[in-house]
Amino acid sequence: MQVFWFLPTHGDSRYLGTAEGARQVDQAYLQQVAVAADTLGYEGVLIPTGRSCEDPWIVAASLIPATRRLRFLVAVRPGLVAPTLAARMAATFDRLSQGRLLVNLVTGGDPGELAGDGLFLDHAQRYEASAEFIRIWRETLAASHEGAALDYTGRHLSVKGARVLFPPVQRPHPPVYFGGSSEAAHALAAEQVDTYLTWGEPPAAVAEKIADVRRRAARHGRTVRFGIRLHVIVRETEDAAWQAADTLISKLDDDTVARAQAAFRKMDSAGQQRMAALHANGIRRSRAELEISPNLWAGVGLVRGGAGTALVGDPHTVAARMREYADLGIDTFVLSGYPHLEEAYRFAELVFPLLPRAVRDTLPGSVLNGPFGEVIATGIVPRVAAS
C-alpha cells in the first residue's frame, strides 16, 4: 500500500465554497505542505492541472530541492503540449529529481475549459488523441535509453525521428497514472498506463471498475495497478469526525451549490457525472443522504469538481475502510484534507500507525531517532501512547 498526499494549487481553506477561512496559497505555503508530506512519510504528492490551478510542472520543479524522498505525481494534458516536448520535460524532471517523477495523464472533461485552451475535440476524439499522445511519450522515452528515435503515424498525432537525448533515470520511463470512468478511458488504461486511478466511489462500484480494467488489460498481456483518490476527515472520535465534516460545508448556501452543479452539468466527463449522481446533483444535503456508503461522504462534491468524496471517521474506522479498498485491489491511496497542511499531519499521526506493516516500515523514524513527543520530567522519553 502506498499513501500519497495532495498539493492544493487551486486554493486551500477551512471551509468549502467561501473565502472565509481561506489562506494564501503561494510557493512558501506549497513548500510547507510538500515538506510535511516528505517528512511524515507520504509516498508522494499529486499536483493537479487545469485553469483553476497553478502550473503543475513549475510548482513541482520548485519543490525538488526542498524535499528528499517525496515523489511528484505531475499532471500532463494532451493537446496543450506536444508529446515529444512532454517527454523531454519528464526526462529532465526525472533527472533533476533523481528519479522522483510520476506522470498523471489527464484527458480533461470540461469542453468549455478545453475550448479556451484551443482544444475542440469531442469526448471520443480526446481519448483517441490521448492514446496517441501517451504512446508517443512512452515509446520516445523508452527509445532514449538506447539513443534511438521514434517514427509514429496516428490519426491525431504523428512524429518522425522523435528523440530525447537525455533519458530519464527511471526505465523505460516514469510510471504513468491515469483516471477515467468511460469505456474509452478503461480501454486506454488497460493498454498503456501503469496505475489506473478512480475517484472515491462505494466499494462495489470500485470493484466493478477494477474488474473491467483487469479484463481488458489481460487481453493485452498486461497487468495494471490500481489507486483511489479520496479526501479524508479523521478525528480521534467518530462524532468529532462527522462534526468536522458538517463544519467543512457549514458556509455553503443554496446559490453556491446550484452554480457549482450547473457548471458540472456542462462537463462531458463520465467520472464527474458519477460523482454528481452520488449527491443527486446537489439535492442531497443531510449527513444521512451524503453518507453513500459506510463512512464514505459525498459532501465535498457539492461544490468541488473531480474527487468529491471523503472517508470520515475515527482512526481505526478510516484504516478499516482503506483496508476494504485494498482488499479489492487498490494499492495506492491519493488523499487530501482541508486545510491540507494540518490534515497531512493529522492523518499521518492518527492513521499511519494503523496501516499495514509494509507502509509503517517505510515511514521516517525508529526507536532510536523518534518521533518521541516532548520529554517527560526532563529525562523520560515517551515511547507509546498513554493508556
Swiss-Prot record:
Gene Ontology biological process terms, A to Z: alkanesulfonate catabolic process
Name this protein carries in UniProt: Alkanesulfonate monooxygenase
Free-text function comment from the UniProt entry: Catalyzes the desulfonation of aliphatic sulfonates.
Family: Belongs to the SsuD family.
Organism: Ralstonia nicotianae (strain ATCC BAA-1114 / GMI1000) (Ralstonia solanacearum)
Catalytic activity from the UniProt record: an alkanesulfonate + FMNH2 + O2 = an aldehyde + FMN + sulfite + H2O + 2 H(+)
Keyword presence, Oxidoreductase: yes
Superkingdom of origin: Bacteria
GO MF, any single term: alkanesulfonate monooxygenase activity
Signal sequence interval, chain numbering: none
Entry annotated with the keyword Flavoprotein: yes
NCBIfam families, per the entry: alk_sulf_monoox, PRK00719.1
Keywords, alphabetical: Flavoprotein, FMN, Monooxygenase, Oxidoreductase
One Pfam family recorded for the sequence: Bac_luciferase
Gene3D superfamilies, A to Z: Luciferase-like domain
EC number: 1.14.14.5
